[in-house]
From Swiss-Prot:
Keywords: Chaperone, Cytoplasm, Stress response. Together with the chaperonin GroEL, plays an essential role in assisting protein folding. The GroEL-GroES system forms a nano-cage that allows encapsulation of the non-native substrate proteins and provides a physical environment optimized to promote and accelerate protein folding. GroES binds to the apical surface of the GroEL ring, thereby capping the opening of the GroEL channel. This is Co-chaperonin GroES. Belongs to the GroES chaperonin family. Heptamer of 7 subunits arranged in a ring. Interacts with the chaperonin GroEL. The gene is groES. One of its GO terms (molecular function) is ATP binding. The keyword Cytoplasm applies. The keyword Transcription regulation does not apply.
Length: 95
């Protein structure tokens, strides 16, 4: 993928939501909620303070993260549906 986010932005791929319930019912696409969990694909270098000093990113490519339901901007890059969001939109890293 030939895309690198700038500054404190992060490129995230949502995890796939389940197609069936535990009881075996198939969930149609119109009834599915978009998951607020994803994997960091790439991230920028970080934000800068007024002094010009770089603030390092807390996340890195490969991290599994949780983010707000309405976070980010949906984009399609190389046929993949991804989200671009600021690092501050990420709520935490799953381990």
């Amino acid at each position: 993928m030939a895309f690198k986010p700038l500054h404190d932005r992060v490129l995230v791929r949502r995890v796939q939501s389940d197609e069936k319930t535990k009881g075996g019912l198939i969930i149609p696409d119109t009834a599915k909620e978009k998951p607020a969990e994803g994997e960091v694909v790439s991230c920028g270098e970080g934000a800068r303070k007024d002094s010009g000093e770089l603030i390092a990113m807390s996340v890195k490519a490969g991290d599994r993260v949780l983010f707000g339901k309405w976070s980010g901007t949906e984009v399609t890059i190389d046929g993949a549906e991804l989200l671009i969001m600021k690092e501050s939109d990420i709520l935490g890293i799953l381990s």
